[in-house]
Amino acid sequence: MRRTDLLSSAGSQAATNEAGNKVVTVDRRTHVTWQDVTPEGYFNRVRTLDLDSGAWSEICTLGSAYDDHARAVMVADGDGFLHAILSGHNTPCTYRRSLRANDAAGWTDPVPVADGTYPYLVCGPGGDLFLTLRNAERWNGVELLTKPHDGPWRHVGKVIERLADYPGYAAFHCGFCFGADRVLHLVSDFYEGFGVWEERGVHQAVAYLQSPDGGRTWRTFRGEPAATPARPCAMDVICQSTGLRHEPMPPPVLAAQGNIALDSAGVPHVLYLYHLNRAGELILASPDESGIWRQRSIDASLRSAYPKHRAMFCRGTFTVDADGVFRALVTLVPAGHSGWDGHLPTRPGLRGIAGGRVPAADPEADNPVMWLISRDRGATFTVREAFPAAAEARSPKYELPVSGVPWPGGRGILYFDRTSRPVPGTREDPGFQNRVYFCRETAW
């Protein structure tokens, strides 16, 4: 049975974007966070669904936001308290904790953590919080911070560093998780170039590291020490490409976007999109018994079911459950869409699909969202529709196993649509409002 509820009619043009977790279930309550935009500015919100009654709480405002990049991520600890990081955009990120366990109605005062963007938050062993942020000083790499269960936030160190040869814009989208042995497994994208508005993305890579001690020291999967801040040459490189691109500010031609998951044996699996061979290739990478990373395309069933579409987005929507079932939530775009330049994604054509404003009548709007599901450890995948194109779902997110409470699986999907209504009563252009929905699916 499916049920879709409207949470807000004022979601920003990036209301649910990026890889960090936005859905948290504790016992019989599900808490969700997203970003609104109003004439007064951007605001991060939270609401709670009572799974027994089906009733939603009133909207609670976590805080104002610098812009549409400054969205919130949220987890729960083992006692059920909620923890939220309110992102900045190369500006201060702040931390808040719920005043009561499993209750999003009241929060502690905001505490500055660090300047940065694109937070990824995990509740680790013993209830300690772990956070990665892109560095705010000209996008210079990735910082790791931690908050002990009963202590303040502290800076652990810089994990990833931008190469000085690439002084321009840089992005490093991370995802990480802990195994039962307390080993931290991290995947990071690299997107570096020479300029801010041109010659972007000259160097792109997806690479992996692990840490046995909460980020103090790092190593490859085979145990080779890796000095940090690290470059791909010291990491397990899963894929990499260097060269001038097809446009000045291209979307990534390869990216994991935080997609890392562990199976029951503690083996990491990384899912990434790769457009250099053909549009929308989905590749699953996993180390074998000798520690060598093996890779295979997994989108054959998707291309067979939707031959006129290609995979474009899979941002922080990949998991492996306790039964060994692999799941990925993938957004498709027609092969002939203006979002493609041949087999490569193009920024002008993607406006309105990932976020931003959508034309009032978009003849190309045909973006179904699909589940890719494997019940044989990733050997084969089946396809199941999550949303038809008519739902106009953008940036769908389901719950990730990053909290300190048992993970219920992805039984609900948070997303925003293509409303793109100008914010009323404003002279300047603060953004566009969209409807934000939560779709609850009981047949997981």
Question: Where do the PLM segments sit?
Answer:
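Extracellular, repeat-based ectodomains that mediate carbohydrate processing or recognition
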Residues: M1-W444
